[in-house]
């Protein structure tokens, strides 16, 4: 479909149910219909490290996946208000993962992601930073990652989740069904 200029967007029921505002704003952004929002330029923002609770509150309101466990949380502040958050998790040997980035969807934040990432690199001097992007929302050729100098390492196959079909519907990651964490009864019969 890409050759015809068509992009399909898959939205899960629980995303729309729990994050309707974020989903609708993402669609507007993809369609280029965000131009009537106030613009905030990175040069007018200060970068401040924040605690996990503050990052969690912001990401719950502005990121479709909410908060992800992080070691470092940076925020972009404009006129005393947090307008963007970028979080990182550390691994061994100065390797890091960029776990979340979100800006306040009430604004068009120009260059803020790049400024947050540059600040992180200057403060923490990582040897390597990796990140994962949901292909449903991130174009593979022109996106925040490529603008910040990331290179595409690979594309993972689609994964699965379990669905608890109560109302409201809930998708549950397969990680929650490992035998180590489930109460499993094992029966044996010996003759």
Which residues fall in each region the model found?
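A conserved mid-domain beta-alpha-beta active-site/ligand-binding segment of alpha/beta enzyme cores
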Residues: 179-191
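Short amphipathic alpha-helical surface micro-motifs
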Residues: 29, 56, 83-84, 188-190
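Short, amphipathic alpha-helical interaction segments positioned at domain boundaries
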Residues: 172-179
